[in-house]
Amino acid sequence: MTQLYRIGQIVPSSNTTMETEIPAMLNARQAIRPERFTFHSSRMRMKQVKKEELAAMDAESDRCAVELSDAKVDVLGYACLVAIMAMGLGYHRQSEKRLQQATADNDALAPVITSAGALVEALHVMKAKRIAIVAPYMKPLTELVVNYIREEGFEVQDWRALEIPDNLAVARHDPANLPGIVAGMDLEGVDVVVLSACVQMQSLPAVAKVEAQTGKPVVTAAIATTYAMLKALDLEPIVPGAGALLSGAY
């Protein structure tokens, strides 16, 4: 009998990409592995990518975890990297523990992944030491993200802030622009390129091109989240066409 897994997604209300890129990867996996997935979301309000609005949104994440645990999902993914990183260094650990406890208190214990924690873990898995980052945020928020990742033990050699404050506009950013952005960055000695430090910024269509262009492994927040979900479900973390991390090399 085919095993079916319920994927729970804690989603900013204005996010339109998490529910396309993560299902796209897991659905692509179905062509090469027997497991099947369904996708279930709960939303927390956010329209402008500003620190105050992100903090207010994060306060709603507990409700989302409880709602998704009502559906007895098998894993939960919190998809707003900057909301977690803007709350303070190492906050992904606190968030994951609290939200998992919320599922346990609802008699539906399930592992909780944050895209922030997933990206940090992915960089460790890929044995990255020196990285480059592309993010859609305004510079002050991007600096918070860069500092957060540095505190997790990585050297950030170069980074780009695309300075898009409206979250819907982030989703509309054309991923075809990403290879050109990366071409202007200093990648000398870089181990891994973080092509999108944001689950809302589309990047999946550009991953293979940037890997070919740079000769370096490329990861994104969405790819890292998908990897972490598969690991949490004790499934082989392999997805065709989703970059080095999900190639089976790790």
Swiss-Prot record:
GO molecular function, a single term: maleate isomerase activity
Induction trigger: Repressed by NicR in the absence of 6-hydroxynicotinate (6HNA) inducer. In presence of 6HNA, repression is alleviated.
Isomerase keyword on record: yes
Modified residues (S-(2-succinyl)cysteine): C80
Residues noted as binding substrate in the record, renumbered to the chain: N15, C80, L81, V82, Y137, N167, V199, Q200
One BP annotation, GO: protein homotetramerization
Reaction equation(s) it catalyzes: maleate = fumarate
Active site per database record: C80 (nucleophile), C198 (proton donor)
Assembly with partners or alone: Homodimer.
Family: Belongs to the maleate isomerase family.
Leftover remarks: Reaction is initiated by nucleophilic attack of cysteine at the double bond, yielding a covalent succinylcysteine-like intermediate.
Protein name: Maleate isomerase
Gene encoding the protein: maiA
